[in-house]
Amino acid sequence: MSDDFAESVTEANAESDTETAADAESSAAEDASAADDAAPEESTGDEQAGETTAESSDAESVTVSERVAEYDDELAAEVEALEARVADLEASVADLETERDEAEETASDLESRLKRTQADFQNYKKRAKKRQQQIKERATEDFVERVVTVRDNLVRALDQDEDADIRDGIESTLKEFDRILEDENVEIIDPEPGTDVDPTRHEVMMRVESDQPADTIADVFQPGYEMAEKVIRAAQVTVSKE
């Protein structure tokens, strides 16, 4: 009886172990099936996450491209503006250079005109001074011509009148005339007989018989006058014949 009971217990335990093993296998199969079912869901989630990341990356790429394009446009606009500014500045520089050249040309022309005007003025001053000197000299010459005529008359009066009272007065007057002529730098041309004739200072009136050498001055008919090396009146002389 004990052996039967032991066998029964053994069989019962074996059956129990069999059932337990079967249950374990069944549970494992179910877990495997559940895992298979869960795997597609996890794969789908990964794919969705990948798609989201790709979309985000594409969006970021588009945004960067747009920003780069906008920056390029802004840079191009700035470059265009700078080029326009440079063109304006170059035009301004060209205008200023033209104005400078015109100003330099005007200044050169004015300088030339000023030099010509100064030269003309200096020439005018010289001509005016020379003219004034000529007028002064001419006036002095006229005065001297009138004075020497009076002097000649006084000399003749001395030669003809021997009255002592009158002679003293005439001589005094003649000395006064000579002083005036000397103040005006007037010299008397009164050559000595026997000297050579100077055509620039002597006027030959005639040839006469004389004890002087031939072709020399025989006598002075009327003295001459010169002022500042200019002959006012030539001395009138006679020349000895051969």
Swiss-Prot record:
Is Repressor among this UniProt entry's keywords?
no
Basic residues: bias regions: 124-133
Query: Where does the UniProt annotation locate this protein?
Result: Cytoplasm
Q: Which GO terms describe its molecular function?
A: adenyl-nucleotide exchange factor activity; protein homodimerization activity; protein-folding chaperone binding; unfolded protein binding
Comp. bias (Low complexity): 23-37
User: Which Gene Ontology CC terms are recorded?
Assistant: cytoplasm
Task: Tell me which stretches of the chain form a coiled coil.
Answer: none
The record's CDD domains line, in alphabetical order, gives: GrpE
A biological process (GO) annotation for this entry?
protein folding
Q: Write down the Pfam families for this protein, in alphabetical order.
A: GrpE (PF01025)
Alphabetized UniProt keyword annotations = Chaperone, Cytoplasm, Stress response
- Matches recorded under InterPro entries: GrpE, GrpE_coiled_coil, GrpE_head
Listed Polar residues bias regions:
50-64
Q: Where is the composition biased (Acidic residues)?
A: 38-49, 96-108
Which residue ranges are recorded for the region named Disordered? 1-75, 93-136
Which proteins does it associate with, and in what oligomeric form? Homodimer.
Please report which protein family the annotation says this sequence is part of.
Belongs to the GrpE family.
This chain's function reads: Participates actively in the response to hyperosmotic and heat shock by preventing the aggregation of stress-denatured proteins, in association with DnaK and GrpE. It is the nucleotide exchange factor for DnaK and may function as a thermosensor. Unfolded proteins bind initially to DnaJ; upon interaction with the DnaJ-bound protein, DnaK hydrolyzes its bound ATP, resulting in the formation of a stable complex. GrpE releases ADP from DnaK; ATP binding to DnaK triggers the release of the substrate protein, thus completing the reaction cycle.
Q: What is the designated name of this protein? A: Protein GrpE
UniProt organism field: Haloferax mediterranei (strain ATCC 33500 / DSM 1411 / JCM 8866 / NBRC 14739 / NCIMB 2177 / R-4) (Halobacterium mediterranei)
Encoding gene per record: grpE
